[in-house]
Each structure stands twice: as C-alpha cells, then as structure tokens.
Amino acid sequence: ADSLTQFDGIKGRYSHEAFYEEKACDSCHLNK
C-alpha cells in the first residue's frame, strides 16, 4: 500500500493506473 501511495503522489494518478495495469500481479504480491 505504501509503495502505491508514494508512486501515486510522485508520478500522478494517471501514471499510477498505467503502472498498476502493467504490474498488477507484482503490486498485489509486494503490497500485500
């Protein structure tokens, strides 16, 4: 959750969505 929050704050919501779409699986595992 922290990583996603920081990424969203730095890159912006649009970039966050693109990042999540590309690495949704990795994000879920890393953040959970």
UniProtKB/Swiss-Prot annotation:
Top-level division of the source organism's lineage: Bacteria
Keywords in alphabetical order: Electron transport, Heme, Iron, Metal-binding, Periplasm, Sulfate respiration, Transport
GO BP field: anaerobic respiration
Keyword S-adenosyl-L-methionine in annotation: no
GO annotation, cellular component aspect: periplasmic space
Residues binding heme, per UniProt: 16, 25, 28-29
Modification after translation, per record: Binds 1 heme group per subunit.
GO MF terms held by the record: metal ion binding
Subcellular location: Periplasm
Quaternary structure and partners: Monomer.
Function of the molecule: Participates in sulfate respiration coupled with phosphorylation by transferring electrons from the enzyme dehydrogenase to ferredoxin.
Protein's name according to its UniProt entry: Cytochrome c3, 10 kDa
Organism, scientific name: Desulfuromonas acetoxidans
